[in-house]
From Swiss-Prot:
Alphabetic keyword roster: 4Fe-4S, Amino-acid biosynthesis, Branched-chain amino acid biosynthesis, Iron, Iron-sulfur, Leucine biosynthesis, Lyase, Metal-binding
Primary gene name: leuC
Binding locations of [4Fe-4S] cluster: C337, C397, C400
UniProt-recorded name of the protein: 3-isopropylmalate dehydratase large subunit
Gene3D superfamilies: Aconitase, domain 3 (3.30.499.10)
The organism of origin for this protein: Bacillus mycoides (strain KBAB4)
Known partners and oligomeric status: Heterodimer of LeuC and LeuD.
Cofactor(s) needed: [4Fe-4S] cluster
Function: Catalyzes the isomerization between 2-isopropylmalate and 3-isopropylmalate, via the formation of 2-isopropylmaleate.
Keyword Cell inner membrane attached: no
Reaction it catalyzes: (2R,3S)-3-isopropylmalate = (2S)-2-isopropylmalate
Family as reported in the entry's similarity comment: Belongs to the aconitase/IPM isomerase family. LeuC type 1 subfamily.
Amino acid sequence: MGKRLLDKLWERHVVVTNENGLDLLYIDLHLVHEVTSPQAFEGLRLANRTVRRPELTFATMDHNIPTKDVWNITDRIAKQQLDTLRDNCKQFKVRLADIGDEEQGIVHVIGPELGLTQPGKTIVCGDSHTATHGAFGALAFGIGTSEVEHVLATQTLWQRKPKAMGIELKGKLPKGVYAKDIILHLLSKYGVAVGTGHVMEFYGETIRDMGMEERMTLCNMAIEGGAKAGIIAPDEKTFSYVKGREYAPKDYETFTGKWSELYTDSDAIYDLHISVDVTDLAPYVTWGTNPSMGVPIDEKLPEKHNENDERAFSYMGLSPGQSTFEIPVKHVFIGSCTNSRLSDLEIAASVVKGKKVKEGVRALVVPGSKSVRERAMQKGLHRIFEEAGFEWREPGCSMCLGMNPDQVPEGEHCASTSNRNFEGRQGKGARTHLVSPAMAAAAALYGHFVDIRKESYDGTISYS
């Protein structure tokens, strides 16, 4: 019987298997940020240990930093965490993308753009959305603080091998429909626990047509379906993306030969399999308090089926049977590790070019990294957004989570390109609606959701 991509990635990294069936995995890349690392570094200090492979460890500041004035950190805990990371990286000789550095940005944005993320690697980070890197054919997953310490100390991690779930995506995406809509559709149809105990492998015609940045969006949100990780077999698009980046292999041809072996064999069998045709897929909007509570833009909000639905409708201030077009959008956030890359900003800019944000709507564009921001500005995207009435910010996690100054006021609705819509995620009482960058941009213009498929834009942009 053939092997799945998961099998090949896993087997390449097993150091030893213990009597309980746990495998000790070697970790190729450890990404670190300011929130989940302080206790881990302190554990090393108390045990008189060092970081075993500092050259395989890379840190950045992203969760806590302000995006309007990055140096004006008024929150005491946030400042302490940032200062602590800076001190820890200096003491333990770990590379740090500090505030103001050209490499700084959201951890799951800078990993790929610096060439740190590569096919065949095992990648961990103290962050749920580490699965993003799986778009490159890497086995990437989030870990807890105690595990962060273990990896820092040993460059290994004890893990039980998950099952393999195949998700075949067939057909061509319609105009105005993106990877974000695919994953929201999957979550709406199959729920937040469908991938529990599995690694999701996305494959098929739709995947082959996708660029790397949309593939990252898919893998980023695999965790929202309960999966350990999301992965996609690397191809020529992957190799081309990695080639020439700062930390990419210099002997490129040697590595691409090895990377080309990373695919699921034709006779391999998944433990669980789903097939979805995206040909008639519509843009999605979430209405509730987890990412599976979503509907196509042209459908009404569903009936209440259980207590969770009852609570969600109450928290969101919405009702069954209500149209998505009736939801009042007061805030728009285009950013996060899900949708803050250059192609995301290009799509949003193509929607708003020459138009104006609706009066009373606060709209933020937060690039995922310094590099994304600079490249966007070279193309004039910042002018398009600012002329439309958006705020053009510095890179950071921003409004994705209520850990920095960018928050949504209680009781107000936000169209967000982030990945989670839990209660209080964007601030106390904030009401979050997950959408694609195109849908978020359009909502900023109207003050409510619209069907982007009916808007007069072609998904491309002229920089003249």
